[in-house]
Amino acid sequence: MESRFTRGKSPLLERPLGRPRGEVSLSAFALLFCELVQYCQRRVYSVAELQSKLAQLGHQVGLRLLDPLVSRERGGRRETKVLSVLLFVKGPVWRALFGKEADKLEQANDDDKTYYVIEREPLVNTFISVPRENSTLNCAAFTAGLVEAVLGASGFPAKVTAHWHKGTTLMIKFEEGVIARDKSLEGR
């Protein structure tokens, strides 16, 4: 009788607390995110306002995501260098959100404070059908707001924007003080 309730999996109370399963059904995520976009779309008048609203909501998620991830992944230790925090975003943050790492992390050739996180097929754009009049809409603005919050709460203030290039590219532009601090840490 007991096996009928557990269905071959370990019982809920016997699972370890340190690493809870964070799996969410893809169809449930798609439905919730589509409804979130529709909700925001009804309350704004332009694509720029819609992307700003999605970024604000992503910012709220990012603030709540950082602390549990740092405590699980790093044992409570925060990053102090720009490259290590970007690798944290590309790896553990992306895996917690989308189940895989981001496709690429690149630095701009001409600017030492600009980095790019490239995702060829972002999950947030997969289930959204965009009308012709809103063809510039990129729902990855939600992810950009989330990454901006994670970086800001980690002590690396930056402006993060989503662009269509090689799929979707998040452009991360750090403040001057962050780069100056990183260079002074390298000198030690």
From Swiss-Prot:
It is found in: Golgi apparatus, cis-Golgi network; Endoplasmic reticulum. GO terms for biological process: endoplasmic reticulum to Golgi vesicle-mediated transport. Its main location: Golgi. GO terms for cellular component: endoplasmic reticulum; TRAPPI protein complex; TRAPPII protein complex; TRAPPIII protein complex. Gene3D superfamilies: Trafficking protein particle complex subunit 3. Part of the multisubunit TRAPP (transport protein particle) complex. CDD domains: TRAPPC5_Trs31. This is Trafficking protein particle complex subunit 5. The lineage of its organism: Eukaryota, Metazoa, Chordata, Craniata, Vertebrata. Belongs to the TRAPP small subunits family. BET3 subfamily.
